[in-house]
């Protein structure tokens, strides 16, 4: 319900079971949606037992975490101080429950051994997935395969490069998502663990033996050695010379213009945290649970909610989190001061931590930064983004299906 109203605004709100064909659609306000959202969450908080969700079911902890997110979202829209305060209280309840904790090594957060949300230390709520071919409809030619598609959607086109062929380790290159230059440059990999865990920038020659054509392009290439290296910075002349006979080297200026527009759309630094080395060669799903809410978001919600009323506590919370993501020995370098904690810093931190987890558009909408950030950082969309994009268009098949077309119309700004 939160996703529906935040995506499309004043649309149809059903609170009773539908028993027959309904051909008319009538809008309900965002306020009506949030009344139901908060009422339902209050029931869950009051009636469910506290505890970690170990099986994909809702617990009191999950309800509190969702309500913290909903309170912050609604507070940003209405400016209600009580909603900001409640968001902070709920988020801190989860933080202080001692049922969730951070991995010392960030790579453990995304290790396939910790992909089960029921046992992952940072996961508050997750959608359960499996590697079962039967449960993922692999044997039904008429059905759409289910399962977590994160294993393939972020993978760049590596299998046409010299020395490379498609394999399980590198996954199927569906290349649906490409990181922006802006996102890559948000990370300081000298002090922050997350860049090297989140992204993949090197691919190793997996052909054995290498073909004649491979060695014609790179005569010093060797199986098991580097085949592709993509840099988030500019390469030096010496790096280019070294690579010229060994592997394909792409630096940030090969992949993007200086303004951030993509030059290459098939080769890029790959968002890699959803990789599954246990997957089967020809499948496009994996066993990873999808983490819907994780512990870091509680820190971000609390810090943002207290930004205007208790900034020092907000800074303390943010620093507590940042030190957990620091490279050992670099904890003090990761810490920030009160003057550095702004809504833009929080958004940058959310990008560093939550990229690829399908929450960014909602974050930018909530903070009324969507148009500003797209104009600054998305060169493909900057000339077209407008305020009406704060709502997404209602799917045309929904509009076609209703009989009261003059009353239930497309969201403002979109062509009918």
For each feature predicted by the language model, list its residue ranges.
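Extended, hydrophobic/aromatic-rich amphipathic alpha-helical segments that build helical scaffolds
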Residues: 1-13, 33-48, 55-95, 125, ...
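Short linear capping/connector segments at secondary-structure termini
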Residues: 15-22
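Short, mixed-charge aromatic SLiMs
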Residues: 22-27, 93-101, 322-331
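A conserved hydrophobic secondary-structure block that centers on an alpha-helix together
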Residues: 23, 49-52
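An aromatic- and glycine-enriched ligand-binding surface/loop that stacks and positions planar moieties
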Residues: 64, 69-243
């Amino acid at each position: 319900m939160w996703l529906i109203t935040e995506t499309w605004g004043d649309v149809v709100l059903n609170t009773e079971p539908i028993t027959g064909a309904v051909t008319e659609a009538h809008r309900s306000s965002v306020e009506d949606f949030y009344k139901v959202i908060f009422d339902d969450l209050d029931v869950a908080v009051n009636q469910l037992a506290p505890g970690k969700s170990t099986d994909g079911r809702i617990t009191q902890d999950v309800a509190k975490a969702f309500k913290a997110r909903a309170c912050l979202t609604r507070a940003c829209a209405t400016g209600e101080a009580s909603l900001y305060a409640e968001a902070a209280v709920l988020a801190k309840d989860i933080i202080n429950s001692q049922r969730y904790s951070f991995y010392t090594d960030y790579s453990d957060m995304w290790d396939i051994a910790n992909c089960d949300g029921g046992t992952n230390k940072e996961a508050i709520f997750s959608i359960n997935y499996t590697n079962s071919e039967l449960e993922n409809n692999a044997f039904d030619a008429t059905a759409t395969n289910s399962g977590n598609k994160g294993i393939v959607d972020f993978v760049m086109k590596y299998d046409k490069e010299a020395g490379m062929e498609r394999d399980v380790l590198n996954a199927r290159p569906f290349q649906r998502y490409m990181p922006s230059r802006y996102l890559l440059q948000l990370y300081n990999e000298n002090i922050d663990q997350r860049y090297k865990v989140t992204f993949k920038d090197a691919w190793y020659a997996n052909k054995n033996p290498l073909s004649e054509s491979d060695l014609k392009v790179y005569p010093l290439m060797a199986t098991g050695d580097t085949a592709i290296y993509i840099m988030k910075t500019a390469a030096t002349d010496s790096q280019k010379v070294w690579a010229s006979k060994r592997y394909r080297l792409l630096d940030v200026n090969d992949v993007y213009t200086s303004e951030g527009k993509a030059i290459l759309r098939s080769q890029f630094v790959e968002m890699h945290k959803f990789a599954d080395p246990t997957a089967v060669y020809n499948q496009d799903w994996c066993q990873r649970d999808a983490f819907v809410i994780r512990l870091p978001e509680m820190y971000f919600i609390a810090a943002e909610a207290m930004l205007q009323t208790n900034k020092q506590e907000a800074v303390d919370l943010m620093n507590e989190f940042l030190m957990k993501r620091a490279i050992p020995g670099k904890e003090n370098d990761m810490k920030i001061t009160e003057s550095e904690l702004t809504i833009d810093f929080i958004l940058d931190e959310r990008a560093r931590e939550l990229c690829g987890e399908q929450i960014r558009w909602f974050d930018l909408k909530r903070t009324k930064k969507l148009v500003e950030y797209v104009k600054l950082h998305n060169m493909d969309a900057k000339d077209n983004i407008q305020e009406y994009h704060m709502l997404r268009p209602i799917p045309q098949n929904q509009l076609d299906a209703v009989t009261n077309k003059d009353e239930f119309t497309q969201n403002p700004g979109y062509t009918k």
